[in-house]
């Protein structure tokens, strides 16, 4: 209680032209202290965040490269299917009189199968990119949250003295006791 009243007395005797300094009392922080804390967090946190984002970017680029390689393989399969289709068309000219409709069905089946394969690979690539992006964003959020919590705990631990700590514990026990009493 002495620290709290001391803070109010200090505010009552605020000098009109004083020196610049940091206020270490967490209950009496001001805009300058908050700006300094945010600046320090940004200064030290941006390197870690940049590294995380660079790692994620490399993973995503690797996934894109893998997807492109799969796409190239599929295009090669498509080209082989087109060559096969050309052969089938040549055979169709020879057998036109006997089985034109059956050859046409095989042609459509080949085109449909290749088209479905391409669509599935494209869908798979897009889903992989989406999930990698979501995972990267979740990991960055989680690490940012952990850093913020660690910073807040460090600030609280450095600012709490033993007397204030015991008063806070007693007040919380009193609140919990009141809650239990109401039940």
UniProtKB/Swiss-Prot annotation:
Membership in a protein family: Belongs to the ATPase B chain family.
Membrane-spanning residues: 25-45
Quaternary structure and partners: F-type ATPases have 2 components, F(1) - the catalytic core - and F(0) - the membrane proton channel. F(1) has five subunits: alpha(3), beta(3), gamma(1), delta(1), epsilon(1). F(0) has four main subunits: a(1), b(1), b'(1) and c(10-14). The alpha and beta chains form an alternating ring which encloses part of the gamma chain. F(1) is attached to F(0) by a central stalk formed by the gamma and epsilon chains, while a peripheral stalk is formed by the delta, b and b' chains.
InterPro entries on file: ATP_synth_b/b'su_bac/chlpt
Superkingdom: Eukaryota
UniProt-annotated location(s): Plastid, Chloroplast thylakoid membrane
GO molecular function: ATP binding; proton-transporting ATP synthase activity, rotational mechanism
Keyword tags: ATP synthesis, ATP-binding, CF(0), Chloroplast, Hydrogen ion transport, Ion transport, Membrane, Nucleotide-binding, Plastid, Thylakoid, Transmembrane, Transmembrane helix, Transport
Annotated organism of origin: Zea mays (Maize)
Pfam family, one: ATP-synt_B
UniProt membrane topology term: Single-pass membrane protein
Miscellaneous comment as given in the Swiss-Prot or TrEMBL entry: In plastids the F-type ATPase is also known as CF(1)CF(0).
Annotated function: F(1)F(0) ATP synthase produces ATP from ADP in the presence of a proton or sodium gradient. F-type ATPases consist of two structural domains, F(1) containing the extramembraneous catalytic core and F(0) containing the membrane proton channel, linked together by a central stalk and a peripheral stalk. During catalysis, ATP synthesis in the catalytic domain of F(1) is coupled via a rotary mechanism of the central stalk subunits to proton translocation.
A GO CC term attached to the entry: chloroplast thylakoid membrane
Name used for this protein in its record: ATP synthase subunit b, chloroplastic
């Amino acid at each position: 209680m002495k620290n709290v009243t001391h803070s109010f007395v200090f505010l009552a005797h605020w000098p009109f032209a004083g020196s610049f300094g940091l206020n270490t009392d967490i209950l009496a922080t001001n805009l300058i202290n908050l700006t300094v804390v945010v600046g320090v967090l940004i200064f030290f946190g941006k390197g870690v965040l940049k590294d995380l984002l660079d790692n994620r970017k490399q993973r995503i680029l690797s996934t894109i490269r893998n997807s492109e390689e799969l796409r190239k393989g599929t295009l090669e399969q498509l080209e082989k299917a087109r060559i096969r289709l050309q052969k089938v068309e040549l055979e169709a000219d020879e057998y036109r009189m006997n089985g034109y409709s059956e050859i046409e069905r095989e042609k459509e089946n080949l085109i449909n199968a290749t088209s479905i394969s391409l669509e599935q690979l494209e869908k798979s690539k897009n889903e992989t990119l989406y999930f990698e992006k979501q995972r990267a964003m979740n990991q960055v959020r989680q690490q940012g949250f952990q850093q913020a919590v660690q910073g807040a705990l460090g600030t609280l631990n450095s600012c709490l003295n033993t007397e204030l700590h015991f008063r806070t514990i007693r007040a919380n026990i009193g609140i919990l006791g009141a809650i239990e009493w109401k039940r």
